[in-house]
């Protein structure tokens, strides 16, 4: 179980005296998650039971968290299905628990859909577009901290662990992305707050009694940052719309996502021209981070890192797939 800081129900009940959420009825650790300790929290107030998620942050510090939490609050207030942070009586949404930053957010309905079909992808695409539009007037600013500058900084640290073919691929792709990021076309791409990590396990789908499903929402915004919207879409397609064994794009799923996104926020000609570049950028970002996690684990790492070859394979596919990429 990925609960690294333990806390008892009695401890939580005392901590929650500063909130107006009612009485604690249950506290259960959540097995998923790598970066934080997460718990399902059941509260009862005026005879009504409500579900929340308590997160204790294991790596991020107090000064690193306001962008993410206030973005979630902003999006929730604009009708986007994301966890809404709950304020304490003093209005603060971030407080200390066991010497670490902690927050309580609303629990989204549903479960992750790990074998998505085109209709799932369409719902994700439409909500991603709505999220991008809703975030346009978010006042806080923070760049995507895992973008080009981080790739450039990290590459010299990981190249000693790579074979000659991998070093060549990484060096050439960094050069390609450096040129792309410095171009006028890149500067012209629209952007704003992005999730930057919208994999299929960071969204939930709810199913009704008739078997119909609906998107319950997006969560885990702790890699979010200001970036190009096309990058966020590329990251999402590179996970939701591929064959996991080969990295090949499933055209039906990808076009369902792209068309649903486009129906909400029309994609532009310059975005079409650089779709391959962004799919490559999305693959590179996660290849670099997985290489870094795999070969240079931090002392506090507590779980097995992901296999980096998955995104190496996806990057090679995106470079070779120029004539067979999905679009609207």
From Swiss-Prot:
EC top class, as a word: transferase
GO biological process, one term: threonine biosynthetic process
Catalytic activity from the UniProt record: L-homoserine + ATP = O-phospho-L-homoserine + ADP + H(+)
UniProt cross-references to CDD domains, sorted A to Z: HomoserineK_II
Origin superkingdom: Bacteria
Gene coding for it: thrB
Entry's EC annotation: 2.7.1.39
GO MF: ATP binding; homoserine kinase activity
Entry similarity comment: Belongs to the pseudomonas-type ThrB family.
Organism: Cupriavidus metallidurans (strain ATCC 43123 / DSM 2839 / NBRC 102507 / CH34)
SUPFAM superfamilies in the record: Protein kinase-like (PK-like)
Transferase is among the record's keywords: yes
Functional pathway: Amino-acid biosynthesis; L-threonine biosynthesis; L-threonine from L-aspartate: step 4/5
Name of this protein: Homoserine kinase
InterPro entries named among the record's database cross-references: Aminoglycoside_PTrfase, Homoserine_kinase_II, Kinase-like_dom_sf, Pseudomonas-type_ThrB
Entry keyword set: Amino-acid biosynthesis, ATP-binding, Kinase, Nucleotide-binding, Threonine biosynthesis, Transferase
């Amino acid at each position: 179980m990925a609960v690294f800081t333990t806390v008892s129900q009695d401890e939580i009940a005392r901590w929650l005296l500063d909130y107006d959420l009612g009485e604690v009825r249950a506290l259960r650790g959540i097995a998923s998650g790598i970066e934080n300790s997460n718990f399902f929290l059941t509260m009862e107030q005026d005879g009504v039971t409500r579900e929340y998620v308590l997160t204790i942050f294991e790596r991020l510090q107090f000064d690193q968290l306001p962008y993410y939490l206030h973005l979630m609050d902003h999006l929730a207030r604009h009708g986007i299905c994301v966890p809404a942070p709950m304020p304490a009586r003093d209005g603060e949404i971030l407080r200390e628990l066991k010497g670490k930053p902690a927050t309580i957010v609303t629990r989204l309905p549903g479960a992750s859909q790990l074998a998505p079909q085109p209709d799932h992808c369409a719902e994700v695409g439409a909500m991603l577009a709505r999220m991008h539009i809703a975030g346009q007037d978010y006042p806080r600013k923070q760049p995507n901290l895992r973008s080009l500058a981080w790739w450039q900084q990290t590459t010299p640290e990981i190249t000693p662990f790579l074979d000659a073919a991998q070093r060549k691929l990484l060096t050439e792709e960094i050069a390609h992305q450096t040129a792309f990021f410095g171009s006028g076309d890149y500067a012209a791409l629209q952007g704003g707050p992005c999730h930057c990590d919208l994999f299929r396990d960071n969204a939930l789908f709810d199913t009704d009694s008739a078997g119909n499903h609906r998107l319950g929402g997006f969560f885990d915004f702790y890699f979010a940052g200001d970036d190009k919207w096309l990058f966020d879409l590329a990251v999402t397609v590179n996970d939701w719309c591929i064959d996991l064994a080969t990295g090949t794009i499933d055209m039906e799923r990808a076009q369902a996502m792209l068309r649903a996104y486009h129906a909400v926020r029309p994609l532009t000609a310059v975005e079409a021209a650089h779709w391959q570049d962004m799919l490559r950028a999305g693959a590179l970002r996660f290849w670099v981070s997985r290489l870094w996690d795999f070969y240079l684990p931090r002392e506090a790492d507590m779980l097995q890192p992901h296999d980096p070859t998955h995104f190496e394979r996806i990057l090679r596919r995106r470079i070779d797939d120029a004539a067979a990429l999905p679009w609207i």
